[in-house]
Amino acid sequence: MNIEEIQSMWEQDSVIDDNHLGEASTDTAKVHAKYIKLMVQVKLRLTKSRAEYNLLRKNKFKYYRGELSREELVGLGWEPYQLIKPLKNEMDEFLQGDQDLINLNTKIEYLETMGYLLEGILGQIKARDWQLKNGIEWKKIGRAHV
């Protein structure tokens, strides 16, 4: 599931038919369950990705310092680092420029954006009952004046 798919689903799910406000009201729980399930999945993926990032960062730190054993390098599928070992004050620059870490950080930021989108959708779903109630009241008032 990606952001565009979630947005597309919400475009369909957010539509409230004025002629079927009662049905829309009873559908709110189903719609909420759908998006809360997505939110939980995204949060779990985000937690896993953050843990992967921390482990990769630790291994990259050791890699650039030349502290990984031959077995660890083989297990990670990396060649030994052949350049000059960076000083401690240079290490952040090395890690920030590492493509593997950049890729994983990009994934984390994408998942955070998905979470932000889902939080917004869930907020709208919470407000939906209020909107439906107002719509029903408005229709009652309109009928009373006819």
PLM features per residue range, with description:
Residues 72-112:
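Short, glycine/alanine-rich amphipathic alpha-helical segment
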Residues 140-142:
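Acidic, proline/serine/threonine- and glycine-rich low-complexity intrinsically disordered segments
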Residues 144-146:
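Conserved small/polar residues in nucleotide/adenosyl-binding loops
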